[in-house]
Amino acid sequence: MTEADSLQEISMPESAEGMRFDSALALELGISRSAVEDIFESGDCIWAVDGEEVKKSDRVKVGDKIRVLLRSKESHTVESARLPVIFEDSDIVVVAKAIGYAAHPSPGWSGPTVIGALKESGVQIAHVGSEEREGIVHRLDVGTSGLMVVAKSERAYTSLKDQFRSREVKKIYHALAQGHLDPAVGTIDAPIDRHPKEDHRFAVVASGKPSVTHYEAIEFFPAVTLARIELETGRTHQIRVHFNAIKHPLVGDLVYGADPRLAERLAMKRPWLHAMELDFRHPTTGERVHFSAPYPPDLEESLASLRRSIGG
């Protein structure tokens, strides 16, 4: 173990009970299937109690605690991969964030970041905002794919922060929710704050911050609904919390009540959630600009699997 390696102790969530450890760990850490494979092949996942190796085919039980060694070389390999750039000029860069990337460095996170990947690919980010969050005006969860805009100039940073604060930015997501949404078009208006008992989760709490999510069903499948979602506010985990609150958790979202058997059947290693569209005023021209990003392969394949099951 080097100074750059990170040893993390993880209490497996109750919702992961019965899943294989490789599937559950990919969801919990928000990393790729190949990265999880490397962890188990290297013997870097052990039981917290006795230090014995965890086998990837072992099944999660309630109360399981493990220790996982995340090696710096693995993080560097992922960091060096280019994120698809959708648009770039002197003020902004719009990227399609892959899963497994945090927006910026933070305590306890040793994996790749959007800022790190952009810098390694030669994108010049102005020193705006706090040092570790330079250029970041909004975030996506590690396990969420899709569009992010990053400010390259002070002018862009100020303009975009103001637009997000005043809710001028239009943010459209696609999500696969368990069950059939009824009504098919609706609004979830429920305040969100940290979960009163579990620090890593958020919940609908009466004293929380106002949070509004609009949704519309796009396509119904047996037992699940593909939905288009527009955020009026932008709280941490907002879509995941709101859909869990209405008893329609996102497929693959074990932290917020998803069925692990369905996640495994659709090979979902993370919540089925994608930031599909972004629309905002360009910081220099003042004109509205619109961007979209296609589904990544894991989401495409899960939909294809659902359609094959219908077609027989």
Where are these regions (language model features)?
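Short Pro/Gly-enriched beta-strand edge/turn motifs at strand-loop
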Residues: 66-68, 196-199, 210-212, 258-263
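Conserved hydrophobic positions within beta-strands
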Residues: 85, 177, 214-217, 250
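Short alpha-helix capping/helix-loop boundary micro-motifs
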Residues: 50-55, 223-226, 264
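The conserved catalytic core of RNA pseudouridine synthases
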Residues: 130-161, 169-170, 174, 189-246, ...
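Short, surface-exposed secondary-structure edge patches
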Residues: 55-59, 228, 270
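RNA pseudouridine synthases
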Residues: 1-187, 191-196, 297-307
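Flexible glycine-rich active-site/ligand-binding loops centered on an Asp-His dyad
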Residues: 166, 170, 174, 178, ...
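RNA substrate-recognition surfaces in RNA-acting enzymes
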Residues: 251-283
